Amino acid sequence: MAQDPRVEMLTAYCSFPDAKLYRDPEHLNKGVFDLPMLDGYEWRRVANYSPSPRLGRFYGLINPGVIKLVAGYDCCVVYGHAYISFWMAICAAKLLGKPVLLGTDATYIDPHNGGRAWKASAKKMLFPFLYNRVADLVLVPSTASKRFLCSLGVREERIALTPYVVDNAYIAGIAAGADRKKTREEWQVPDDGVVVIFCAKFLPRKRPQDALRAFARAKVENSYLMMVGDGPLADSLREEVARLGIADRVRFTGLVKYSRLAEFYAASDVLVFTSEHEPYGLPVNEAMICGIPAIVSDRVGAGYDLVDTGRTGFVYPCGDVDALATILSQVLPDRELLKRMGEQSRARMKTWSPRENADATIRAVEKAMGKEQSAKG
């Protein structure tokens, strides 16, 4: 988007990867993202003055420098509202009379919310006010998010769908040059085997145990399951594999550098993504770009836009291991079906790319500013 002549933009970072910030399992994979993230666009690191810097806490980011940055541009886009710094930017823009676009990937409100039911009730009241009254427009990454906001009373005309994307060209390039046979030799998996890949943190909300149990119940000959990731459930998952009697067909790879991840997808045949709380789910994008279909739970936001049943994958009820096992037992033996779905998956991603994201975002900014011309923001 930074190369688009319609906009002059600055990205402000209120935090950078730091051990002091990442103190929970949700951020255990930050060290494996080994691609340059600061090239090709103008950005600024804003000093954080929080006495207790930490992600996931409202006062973990206190960056008053955002106020001056907002003052220098025509429009302000804020992705989220969970930190005091974000509210500084929002309030500065409103006081200065500048359009404010807010971004959210929320797809539902957890009624339990870590044992704090009052937060769920508060959000049901906050979201309509925030997105109907405070924001000029709301940016969402998926149809799932759009439907959720509409269900809370946010007006549809105030919502702009800006596709959640990865670097399609980079991933496709790695996949095209990948040596499938060599990667499988590394895994100790036969070249004629059918491979299911699970790629996520081993956290309760990701439900990795469902992938193991469904794979075991499917009982497909010459099939293998790659568990790519790590996390608090790692030991219990290995114990589960032994209990299920599938240790000879399951591989745990640990965390994988992002620069190699496309090789892993390219050497696989289908992605399984079992999360119960996944506002979007970028592994679905990554897998489909590499030419493999995705089987996802109905709590994965990406499923609404990318998974076309029988063409680019399947959607099953979250937690229904039998339903997932049935899909695996039907799909894994059918190599022609997997190949065809893989080709359709790759084709689908040609219209869900950074180009579509940039176009949608710029259109939203122009709409918020009430004009169809170049914008500085």
What is the role of each PLM region?
Residues 99-101, 108-134, 145:
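Nucleotide-sugar donor phosphate/pyrophosphate-binding loop at the beta->alpha transition
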Residues 127-128, 132-182, 189:
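Donor nucleotide-sugar binding/catalytic pocket of nucleotide-sugar-dependent glycosyltransferases
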Residues 190-206, 212-215:
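Conserved donor-binding/catalytic core segment of Leloir-type glycosyltransferases
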Residues 249, 323, 330, 337-351:
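A short, well-ordered alpha-helix in the C-terminal region of glycosyltransferases
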Residues 255-256, 263-268:
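Short alpha-helical donor nucleotide-sugar binding micro-motif in glycosyltransferases
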Residues 276:
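Aromatic "clamp/platform" in nucleotide-sugar-dependent glycosyltransferases that forms part
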Residues 293-297, 307:
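Short hydrophobic beta-strand element within catalytic cores of glycosyltransferases
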Residues 308-310, 314-321, 330-335:
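Conserved acidic donor-binding segment of nucleotide-sugar-dependent glycosyltransferases
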